[in-house]
Structures are given as C-alpha cells and as structure tokens.
C-alpha cells in the first residue's frame, strides 16, 4: 500500500513580496529549493502562519542567495510581505519500503530566508 509522507519542508520563511498580477505560483530562492530537496514546478502545500491560510501551488525559480519568497497570482491574496510561511512537499512511497529511520529534509531559515 502506498502512503503519502512529507518529503521536504522550508520552515517559517518570510514572504518578501506578493505579485497579484503574475501568472501564478510561488517564487523560491533556489538555494532553499535545493536544500529542501524540492524541484522547480513541483507541487507544494503552503501554510501561512500569520493568518492560517493553506493553499497549493508550484515552485518557480528564484535567484540564488536572494532569500526571495514571493506569492504570485491568486496566492498573493493569501499572504503579504512579512508573513511567515511553511512550504511542504510530499512523496508517495510503498509503506513496506519506508525505512524506520526515514527523515524528510527540513530547512530552517533566519529572518532573511538564509538557511540556518
């Protein structure tokens, strides 16, 4: 039987911008994408710590080292600059193949979205 497990998480990133008129998605600094084992265009769940909003979108490439976390398109209505968010990816795995010591990649960031 397959189960869904957390694959990666960027914890308490600070939203640096919100662009309502952009086509859609979430722009994320590629240093954070790589550190969390995520991929460009991968589906993500986003939780806004400030207002409780939860939504799904996909990642687009942000400039490395920029700390950029931008809510684009309709997602811009669910958060604003300065909000803290959690970005989560999931994977489908065979339950019997999931190692007992499985650990997802979790990236904690500082107030400028630099990996701690």
Swiss-Prot record:
Annotated CDD domains: Asp_decarbox
Gene Ontology annotations for the cellular component aspect, listed alphabetically: cytosol
Predominant place of localization: cytoplasm
Pfam families according to UniProt: Asp_decarbox
InterPro entries, per database record: Asp_de-COase-like_dom_sf, Asp_decarbox
SS bond list: none
SUPFAM superfamilies with a match to the protein in the record: ADC-like
Keyword Cytoplasm: yes
Function field: Catalyzes the pyruvoyl-dependent decarboxylation of aspartate to produce beta-alanine.
Subunit-level organization: Heterooctamer of four alpha and four beta subunits.
PANTHER family noted in UniProt: ASPARTATE 1-DECARBOXYLASE
Name recorded for this polypeptide: Aspartate 1-decarboxylase
Biological source species: Leptospira interrogans serogroup Icterohaemorrhagiae serovar copenhageni (strain Fiocruz L1-130)
